[in-house]
From Swiss-Prot:
Keywords assigned: Acetylation, Isopeptide bond, Proteasome, Ubl conjugation
Family to which the UniProt record says this protein belongs: Belongs to the proteasome subunit p55 family.
Annotated InterPro entries: PCI_dom (IPR000717), PSMD12-CSN4-like_N (IPR054559), PSMD12/CSN4 (IPR040134), RPN5_C (IPR040896), WH-like_DNA-bd_sf (IPR036388), WH_DNA-bd_sf (IPR036390)
Origin species: Mus musculus
Disulfide bridges in this chain: none
Cross-link (Glycyl lysine isopeptide (Lys-Gly) (interchain with G-Cter in SUMO2)): 92
Residues modified to N-acetylalanine: 2
Domain of life: Eukaryota
Encoding gene, per UniProt annotation: Psmd12
The protein, known as: 26S proteasome non-ATPase regulatory subunit 12
Sequence positions bearing N6-acetyllysine: 368
Purpose of the protein: Component of the 26S proteasome, a multiprotein complex involved in the ATP-dependent degradation of ubiquitinated proteins. This complex plays a key role in the maintenance of protein homeostasis by removing misfolded or damaged proteins, which could impair cellular functions, and by removing proteins whose functions are no longer required. Therefore, the proteasome participates in numerous cellular processes, including cell cycle progression, apoptosis, or DNA damage repair.
UniProt keyword Ubl conjugation present: yes
Length: 456
């Protein structure tokens, strides 16, 4: 490295002018011996003088050894003030070599892990974060120190401060950091943002992770952590279709597929959330794809429930509750229930949403088989009041799921979509052409018959 040149703090690449390796080899053992005798201040002054010579001569290896030796002696003597002071001093020296500072910071990072005294640890972290601020060549060390600081803050109950500290890091721009470690940092940022209920920032941070990364080897734990965090986020947003997709990703993970209990719970959640999602083309497509999964045979109740929503028949809510209520909310000894319809506020809300999906399914079936129906008859089929039925119908019309027009005075709903004038004209023209062709053919046949009879 020394032969190839070293980089100074101002960005200049310099070549080693004098090799101080022999001098440093001789001086360091002497200094270590003196430091153990309690003459630390004297030793540091000697080493600082030697450091100036090695730095001026651009001897990166020797400078690194001296910087590491200084902080090591301060640490072993437990002179914490002196340690922090020398870290600041050595990193700010004129034309300091970047590689030497990096070596010193890396050495100090090991001390952070070893120190048990919290105030001392926090002060050392603050010093190192100050030294590494804005320096690309020690960005990984700064990121790790920041993560350690955030963990300490969280353990002390200051989750908001922990989230704020960790958000400072833009680790997605750290090219020198391994992809796996980058993802770990981003997941930690997401977790802390969720802990302080900062859902918008969590959504922004989540987009920094490319899900293709989870196709690589040894990423299953990170994949599960990511999708569980995304489920928490989308549960707050009430986006059931997204939650269904997240559970499908968990279900498709090899380590989940390997354990029967885990994949069954994941598949149950997939089924329930796809049913809870409002009807649209994407939801309908996903329902049919999930229905084709052969593993549904092993959880028959959930398979039958999903089939109800793909069959073009009306459902009665009371019958559904009677047949599936206990299984969905409490489970059985063979198939434990999921937390989708738990006894919490969120679970009760999802249960109400399930009833809404049943009603919406029934209205779509009516729109398919009826052209006109009275409000009273529709309310009777839905087991709802007229006002409730009208509210559900209006919602589906607004979302363009179905077409309907309500004649309130007559109390009649018309599901027949009015035809476009151009289409009507085209149909009339086509039918007229067909009629004229038929008349022409008939006239021709009559004339033919007359000619045959005249000949006879």
């Amino acid at each position: 490295m020394a032969d190839g040149g070293s980089e100074r703090a101002d960005g200049r690449i310099v070549k080693m002018e004098v090799d101080y390796s022999a001098t440093v080899d001789q001086r360091l053992p002497e200094c270590e011996k003196l430091a153990k005798e309690g003459r630390l201040q004297e030793v540091i002054e000697t080493l600082l003088s030697l450091e100036k010579q090695t730095r001026t001569a651009s001897d990166m290896v020797s400078t690194s050894r001296i910087l590491v030796a200084v902080v090591k002696m301060c640490y072993e003597a437990k002179e914490w003030d002196l340690l922090n002071e020398n870290i600041m001093l050595l990193s700010k020296r004129r034309s300091q070599l970047k590689q030497a500072v990096a070596k010193m910071v890396q050495q100090c990072c090991t001390y952070v892990e070893e120190i048990t005294d919290l105030p001392v640890k926090l002060r050392l972290i603050d010093t190192l974060r100050m030294v590494t601020e804005g320096k690309i060549y020690v960005e990984i060390e700064r990121a790790r120190l920041t993560k350690t600081l955030a963990t300490i803050k969280e353990q002390n109950g200051d989750v908001k401060e922990a989230a704020s500290i960790l958000q400072e890091l833009q680790v997605e721009t750290y090219g020198s950091m391994e992809k796996k470690e980058r993802v770990e940092f981003i997941l930690e940022q997401m977790r802390l943002c969720l802990a302080v209920k900062d859902y918008i920032r969590t959504q922004i941070i989540s987009k920094k992770i490319n899900t293709k990364f989870f196709q690589e080897e040894n990423t299953e734990n990170l994949k599960l952590k990511y999708y569980n965090l995304m489920i928490q986020l989308d549960q707050h947003e009430g986006s059931y279709l997204s939650i269904c997709k997240h559970y499908r990703a968990i279900y498709d993970t090899p380590c989940i597929q390997a354990e029967s209990d885990k994949w069954q719970q994941a598949l149950k959640s997939v089924v329930l959330y796809v049913i809870l999602a409002p009807f649209d083309n994407e939801q309908s497509d996903l329902v049919h794809r999930i229905s084709s999964d052969k593993k549904l045979e092993e959880i028959p109740k959930y398979k039958d429930l999903l089939k109800l929503f793909t069959t073009m028949e009306l459902m009665r809510w009371s019958t559904l509750v009677e047949d599936y209520g206990v299984e969905l909310r409490k489970g059985s000894s063979e198939t434990p229930a999921t937390d989708v319809f738990s006894s919490t506020e969120e679970g009760e809300k999802r249960w109400k949403d399930l009833k809404s999906r049943v009603v919406e399914h029934n209205i779509r079936i009516m729109a398919k088989y009826y052209t006109r129906i009275t409000m009273k008859r529709m309310a009777q089929l839905l087991d709802l009041s007229v006002d409730e039925s009208e509210a559900f119908l209006s919602n589906l019309v607004v979302n363009k799921t179905i077409f309907a027009k309500v004649d309130r005075l007559a109390g009649v709903i018309n599901f027949q979509r009015p035809k476009d004038p151009n289409n009507l004209l085209n149909d009339w023209s086509q039918k007229l052409n067909s009629l004229m062709s038929l008349v022409n053919k008939t006239t021709h046949l009559i004339a033919k018959e007359e000619m045959i009879h005249n000949l006879q």
